């Protein structure tokens, strides 16, 4: 796979004789690798986490609703901040080529055939060589160490998230 981790942002590069978005190109390359595992595989379920402190909820992507981090799971293993049973079930579905219903936004985007879904972009954001293999080895039961961590300390939206604001 031709991938350059040192390229940041959305640079225009000459690719195959024409100028294209390097970010989009790299996301397409990562998507090809994801699809070798399954057509529903997404690295975000393993390696992205948003933790909402005031509500005790978590999610790996901003499209699905966040879900409660069960206190009993957290008492047994503090990695349940990210590795909840719910997320592990979703990972199992993805490994088996089943589309988790909570990821409907991406499935609708992909089914439209008009553009890449956030499955490609969120996976590309954390991608590094060997990460797909690591996720496969962890399977649905392993405890993944996130590469992207977002902690929300209050519920107020100030439109300053990276996906709402360029600042």
Question: What does each of the following model-derived ranges do?
Answer:
Residues 3-5, 12, 17-124:
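Accessory C-terminal segments flanking Radical SAM cores
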Residues 7-9, 155:
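Low-complexity, compositionally biased segments
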Residues 24-25, 36, 135-138, 161:
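Short charge-dense sequence patches
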Residues 43, 90, 140, 148-151:
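A general structural-boundary detector
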Residues 111-147, 159:
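Recognition helices and adjacent regulatory flanks at domain boundaries
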């Amino acid at each position: 796979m031709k991938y350059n981790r040192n390229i940041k942002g959305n640079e225009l590069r000459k690719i195959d004789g024409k100028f294209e978005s390097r970010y989009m190109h790299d996301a397409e390359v990562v998507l090809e690798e994801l699809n070798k595992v399954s057509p529903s595989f997404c690295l975000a379920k393993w390696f992205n986490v948003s933790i909402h402190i005031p509500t005790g909820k978590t999610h790996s992507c901003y499209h699905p609703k966040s879900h409660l981090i069960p206190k009993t799971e957290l008492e047994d293993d503090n990695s349940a901040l990210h590795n909840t049973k719910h997320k592990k079930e979703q990972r199992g579905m993805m490994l088996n080529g089943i589309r988790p219903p909570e990821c409907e936004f991406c499935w609708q985007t992909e089914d439209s055939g008009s553009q890449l879904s956030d499955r490609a972009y969120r996976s590309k954001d954390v991608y590094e060589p060997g990460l797909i293999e690591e996720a496969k080895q962890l399977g649905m039961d392993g405890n993944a160490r996130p590469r992207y961590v977002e902690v929300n300390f209050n519920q107020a939206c100030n439109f300053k998230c990276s996906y709402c604001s360029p600042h």
